[in-house]
Amino acid sequence: MKSVTLKLVIVLALVGAFAAQTATAQQHPPAKELLLWQKLDTFVQSENRNLDGVLGVTILDLSNQYTLLLNADEVFPTASTIKIAILAELYRQAQQGKLKLTDTYTLQQSDLVGGSGICNALTPGVTKLTLRDVAALMISVSDNSATNILIDRVGQENVNALLDSLNLTHTRLRRKMKDIKAAAAGRENVATPRELTQFLEALYRGKVLNKQFTDDYFILLSTPKSSYIPRELPEDLKIANKPGELEGVRNDCGLVFNGSRPYIICAMSTYVRQERAAGDAIARISGETYRMFDRLSRSSPYGRVVSPRDTSAP
């Protein structure tokens, strides 16, 4: 499969027709850098062929907008990855003065649902948490009870309004966590790899929150967690990500703060027969992506390494 260079973006690894991009000027990556992108393209395509399921990937270089796309506009179940949008709406309402992250909430018996998390081990009627604490549980251990508390607090319709304001029309919060009846009726939380990437990029570029809330948003999203993107990456590298898992579904989407070459990677899979294989594929794609960006961030235009590994935020 060939690759093409479009306006301000290099688009690789698409199944079928290439997606059109609009911009005002033409920009091409240096020839040797293009070869690295092509090698990454080949790697991603190989993982896609070997996976017994459907895989979608978007990789965005935040320093120059070069992008790799595989099934990037296919709609996938988000599982817990949708929680990055719930978190953003919480922070947006805090910025607007509609709530404070330090507001407290008393855990109720009716809040408790199954699945991942630790709220079920806490004492209802007694346990008090700040809204930021509730958000931390939602992100760090993917607590479904905590997530539903926040959905009630910020409003499902407001999460979708935020997505609409960014023209993300395929990314939807349609139900609470563990609402099996809603899922069976087809009200699934969904997104595309491209739109989740665009969502994180909008946050990174300050288009959703001011600097104070943007910084804290990514601090919370960078909480270490069991996930796929960091598995093959250095432990001291800042990674703001949120995985998601359902039966037949494995996802992970995040921003890797790789010094002068930060990037976003979003990988989603569905119709997966072997979930472990899908998670392993996402981890390998993430590892190969990091190794390319690490070389680019530390090398001269000729490829000679001229600086040590940089894990600082740009």
Question: At which residue positions do the language-model features occur?
Answer:
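Bacterial N-terminal signal peptides that target proteins for export
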Residues: 1-10
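Bacterial N-terminal signal peptides
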Residues: 9-19
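Structured C-terminal helix/loop/strand segments within mature extracytoplasmic catalytic/sensor domains
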Residues: 26-50, 153, 198-227, 234, ...
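A short, well-structured edge-of-sheet supersecondary motif
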Residues: 37-72
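Mid-domain, small-residue-enriched loop/turn segments at the edges of structured enzyme/sensor domains
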Residues: 54, 127, 148-200, 204-205
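Acidic helix-start/capping segments at beta-turn-to-alpha-helix junctions
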Residues: 62-63, 101-119, 154-155, 220, ...
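Active-site SXXK
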Residues: 65, 76-105, 265
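Conserved catalytic neighborhood of penicillin-recognizing serine enzymes
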Residues: 112-148
